């Protein structure tokens, strides 16, 4: 029967703190002079001053990391992970205790100059947010640490930078700026920059926090190759529990102390490495075929999902024309026109003429006539758009009976004088009919004189309005017309509605538009 190994085993349990439930290593267990240790921390404390009070971030951390190890640091927020990473990276100094990094002893008395040189020469950083210089290309970003170190010539720096970018799969992105790269590509440039000076330790602060599943697998494969092939020590802070199985040891932190240390079994780690390599091979095949893959589960690597970004292209023909709707409902329009009787005379209403009208309010109902060469487009119930071209064709298509409907309708230029006389005799209207002959000679309407002004096209969409003396309601007709156009149907208004004149609607629309 095959022996089953647990994924992790707890390394040492000493000096248990019942309140915090933490596990620490005694100082006697730390060999400060072990040459195999790339990092040794002994009773490290860090306290930040907040006013007159001190806030402890680290409280007696002791540990040793051997050269070439892969360490994962886990813990809740506020547990001291980032503070410990800053101290290891010489960005900050401990308040108390000693640390030995790459053979150099560091304490609270170490100068910033010594820390800066040690950081430049022996440590590489990979951050969650990449921290690339936006004004420099990928090649120039990788060259920057080598320029600061000053050990290579310009040609040697460029040659090494190209070699590093080729290693991380960015050979075709040398002259691209960070804004032109995806998140995974930026992280690969960050890794190339971090290893530019051949560091002994690579510090990783949430390196896959901003990446998707595919890029996470690619980055982890790249990091594990650096660890195994070039013997670079990796110390990674992460919240992704799926990444801990690639490491050698797992350090759990809580309240500024090491809670426990776990060691990952070789068999379990080997299985995860094999699965990672298979995933990366499949990713490479899909990328060659132009497909981006996402693994839904760990058991079936072939079960992938295509990803992509769709761009919507809109053309004028994609918009719905309400004119076509009116053509299909011409019977409804004719019925609404024929059923409108002499209600305006009974109510002592005012009639307003508009020679370019394509709809009329009759008997409290808004009806739309069939319009040729002029379309009203609407998309997703947004604001309607009107086309005021060829209004003369509209006028020629509108023939209403003025004697029966008491409306000032638009007839052909040959019948304009007769229609105006009928309107003046039957309706006693105070509209602009006295000058209709001259108006008709000048393309019949204000809207024809202002073909580029859409306000008059909207205002002329009603050829007569009933002005009732009962002021029981003060509703705006603009919203009603807007809804009517969007819905493409006739709106029903009650006879008690106080409708506005064309000039009033024009003024309202001027304020809105």
Curated annotation (Swiss-Prot):
Binding residue positions for ATP: 75-82
Biased composition (Polar residues): 361-386
Organism: Dictyostelium discoideum
A Pfam family matched in the record: ABC_tran
PANTHER family assigned: ABC TRANSPORTER H FAMILY MEMBER 2, IMPORT ATP-BINDING PROTEIN
Region (Disordered): 291-471
Protein name in UniProt: ABC transporter H family member 2
Residue ranges of domain ABC transporter in the record: 39-280
Family the UniProt entry places it in: Belongs to the ABC transporter superfamily.
Keywords: ATP-binding, Nucleotide-binding, Transport
InterPro entries linked: AAA+_ATPase (IPR003593), ABC_transporter-like_ATP-bd (IPR003439), ABC_transporter-like_CS (IPR017871), ABC_transpr_LolD-like (IPR015854), MacB-like_ATP-bd (IPR017911), P-loop_NTPase (IPR027417)
């Amino acid at each position: 029967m095959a022996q089953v190994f647990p994924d992790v085993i707890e390394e040492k349990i000493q000096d248990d703190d019942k309140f915090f439930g933490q596990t620490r290593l005694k100082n006697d267990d730390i060999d400060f002079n072990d040459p195999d240790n790339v990092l040794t921390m002994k009773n490290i404390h860090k306290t930040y001053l907040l006013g007159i009070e001190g806030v402890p971030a680290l409280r007696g951390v002791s540990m040793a990391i051997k050269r070439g190890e892969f360490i994962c640091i886990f813990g809740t927020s506020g547990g001291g992970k980032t503070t410990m990473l800053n101290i290891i990276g010489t960005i900050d100094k401990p308040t108390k205790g000693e640390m030995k990094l790459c053979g150099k002893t560091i304490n609270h008395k170490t100068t910033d100059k010594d820390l800066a040189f040690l950081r430049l020469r022996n440590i590489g950083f990979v951050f969650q947010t990449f921290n690339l210089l936006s004004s420099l290309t990928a090649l120039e970003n990788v060259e920057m640490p080598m320029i600061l170190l000053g050990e290579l010539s310009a040609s040697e720096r460029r040659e090494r930078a190209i070699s590093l970018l080729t290693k991380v799969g960015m050979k075709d992105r040398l002259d691209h700026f960070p804004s032109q790269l995806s998140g995974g590509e930026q992280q690969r440039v960050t890794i190339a920059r971090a290893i530019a000076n051949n560091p002994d330790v690579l510090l990783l602060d949430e390196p896959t926090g901003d990446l998707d599943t595919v890029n996470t697998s690619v980055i982890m494969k790249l990091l594990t190759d650096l660890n195994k092939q070039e013997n670079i020590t990796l110390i990674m802070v992460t919240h992704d529990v799926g990444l801990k199985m690639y490491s050698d040891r797992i350090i759990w932190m809580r309240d500024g102390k090491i809670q426990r240390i776990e060691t990952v079994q070789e068999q379990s780690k080997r299985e995860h490495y094999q699965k990672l390599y298979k995933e990366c091979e499949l990713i490479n095949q899909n990328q060659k075929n132009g497909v981006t893959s996402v693994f839904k589960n760990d058991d079936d690597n072939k079960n992938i999902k295509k990803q992509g970004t769709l761009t919507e292209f809109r053309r004028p023909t994609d918009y719905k024309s309400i004119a076509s709707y009116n053509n299909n409902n011409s019977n409804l329009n004719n019925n609404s026109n024929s059923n409108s009787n002499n209600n305006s005379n009974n109510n002592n209403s005012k009639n307003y003429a508009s020679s370019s009208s394509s709809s009329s309010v009759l008997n409290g109902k808004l009806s739309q006539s069939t319009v040729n060469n002029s379309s009203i487009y609407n998309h997703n119930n947004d604001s309607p758009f009107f086309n005021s071209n060829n209004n003369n064709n509209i006028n020629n298509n509108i023939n209403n009976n003025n004697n029966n409907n008491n409306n000032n309708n638009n007839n052909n230029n040959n019948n304009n004088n007769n229609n105006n006389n009928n309107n003046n005799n039957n309706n006693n209207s105070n509209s602009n009919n006295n000058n209709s002959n001259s108006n008709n000679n000048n393309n019949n309407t204000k809207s024809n004189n202002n073909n580029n002004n859409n306000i008059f096209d909207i205002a002329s969409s009603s050829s007569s309005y009933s002005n009732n003396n009962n002021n029981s309601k003060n509703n705006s007709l603009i919203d009603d017309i807007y809804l009517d156009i969007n819905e493409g149907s006739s709106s029903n208004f009650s006879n008690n509605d106080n409708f506005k004149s064309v000039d009033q609607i024009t003024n309202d629309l001027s304020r809105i538009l």
